[in-house]
Curated annotation (Swiss-Prot):
It comes from Methanopyrus kandleri (strain AV19 / DSM 6324 / JCM 9639 / NBRC 100938). GO terms for molecular function: ATP binding; ligase activity, forming carbon-nitrogen bonds. This is tRNA(Ile2) 2-agmatinylcytidine synthetase TiaS. The gene is tiaS. It comes from the Archaea. It holds the Pfam family Zn_ribbon_TiaS. It is found in: Cytoplasm.
Amino acid sequence: MDWVALDDTDSPAGGCTTHAAVLLRAELAEAGAEPVGRPLLVRLNPNVPFKTRGNAAVALPVEAPWSVDIEAVVLRALKKVVRKGYPETRPGLVVCEGEPPRVCESVYEEAVRRILNPGRVKESVDDDVNVVLEGRGIVGAVAALGFARVRKDHEVTFEGIAYRAEKYWGTERRVEESSIREFDRRTFPVTFDNLDSRDGDVLITPNTPCPVLYGVRSVEPDVLEVAPDMIKTREPVVEYEIFESNQATDAHLVRVDRLADAEDYSNPVLDLTVVEEPRRIPGGHVVVRCEDEEGVRVDIAAFRPARPLTEVVAALHPGDEIRVAGALRPETPKHPRTVNVEKLRVLRLERVEEVRNPVCGRCRRSMKSAGRKKGFKCSCGERAPEDSKIGVEVPRELVEGVTYEAPPVARRHLSKPEYLVELGLLEPSPLSR
């Protein structure tokens, strides 16, 4: 079995790497290289500054007789796929005969968590795979081969993607919302994140001018076979493909003991202590300053689209101990290093007290001030000194041991929904370990 892997065939203006892969596979089949198994949809580090949208690469398993020149076929086919030309794209395309080499495995493990240099990636695999196109997308292409090696030992999910006819690209998607809701009712939680948990908005139809009509995610592939029959559309579905993927597996998260070891643009899991009161900033976002066990400080931020996670961050108090996972942004002249929170687990809540007037010892009612420096008095005639105010514990809105997360509409492709963990459909996330 041979492999063809590619990345960076799309741009903000259009295109889609998974669609390019589907078209490539059709060209390969026509040339005599038959598809074997499911194509792989591999999400990479979501914090790469120059990514287009979802930062995805694709790997295609094929069985090709010796007479088929796979490199020539895929190169010719890729030129057709990007014939309209997106100047921002720098495709990477690699062909591997047989099982991908071990070096690809390490590239995947790093590419899903860090930013890699394309030139160094090419050098690392030059002797083991055939590099057909060596643009910036070579990182994702080689990483996709690495995922092909490790997926049997890693958690996987699946996505069924329906594609539009080209004449509909850039127009409003014609999918019957009622059929999506019925599909969700009958298949959830095996399929997940079809609807937003807050307001029920449909999430499976993208808002970009790409060729995707809709995409449905699942913890098992069989249910995706019936999606095209259940989800009704008022435009033709020209292709439908089920991909095996690392989506919703938290593969991007890295457990880090201290901030000094966390790389900018990585996705660390950090244990922190809140040191200042949360503050709201313009736009409805919430920021709070924290520190690690060495006293190194960092801001954590929750943005308005992620509410109610914003309210979770707003409910924190100095002294609270938390575990956070998210995107680590570098320091700028205006802002310190900041973790954009994906998930937050409460480890320990600080006791918060509110100072109140004393309670009358005779009638058990709250006393009132008797005047400046005159202590307190009660309507029954009882009095109390100035220093008799009492501290009353304030109930906290948060709960120790609970992991809070962004809602589906704001969830990253790689981020694991905690409710699937609670239902036993996915393994515990790094925040729970």
